[in-house]
């Protein structure tokens, strides 16, 4: 019985610390934390004989490159869908 009480007290203390941290967050931090980053390129399989994997633009899937960094720098960013 004593160990279960100790466990509950520990869980309660950890919950209070987490709640305290959430209250201390600024509005700017909360707005920034709910954004999802979608990279401009995705990995795909290519029809090339020597190289099976390539990286294609999400906005223009017909544009594909062998190097992911090159693809990320040359692809236009994806436009978010807003309803």
From Swiss-Prot:
One of its GO terms (biological process) is embryonic axis specification. Disruption phenotype: No visible phenotype, due to redundancy with ESF1.2 and ESF1.3. Simultaneous down-regulation of all 3 genes by RNAi induces embryo abnormalities. Disulfide bonds join 41-56, 46-75, 54-71, 57-64. Keywords: Developmental protein, Disulfide bond, Signal. Pfam families: ESF1. Residues 1-22 form the signal peptide. InterPro entries: ESF1_brassicaceae. Expressed exclusively in ovule embryo sacs and in early developing endosperms. It comes from the Eukaryota. Belongs to the MEG family. Maternally-contributed central cell peptide regulating suspensor development and correct auxin distribution in early developing embryos. This is EMBRYO SURROUNDING FACTOR 1.1. The lineage of its organism: Eukaryota, Viridiplantae, Streptophyta, Embryophyta, Tracheophyta.
């Amino acid at each position: 019985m004593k160990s279960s009480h100790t466990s509950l007290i520990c869980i309660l203390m950890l919950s209070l610390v987490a709640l305290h941290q959430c209250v201390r967050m600024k509005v700017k931090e909360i707005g920034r934390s709910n954004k999802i980053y979608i990279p401009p390129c995705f990995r795909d399989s290519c029809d090339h004989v020597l190289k099976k994997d390539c990286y294609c633009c999400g906005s223009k899937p017909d544009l594909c490159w062998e190097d992911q960094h090159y693809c990320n720098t040359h692809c236009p960013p994806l436009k978010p869908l807003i309803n």
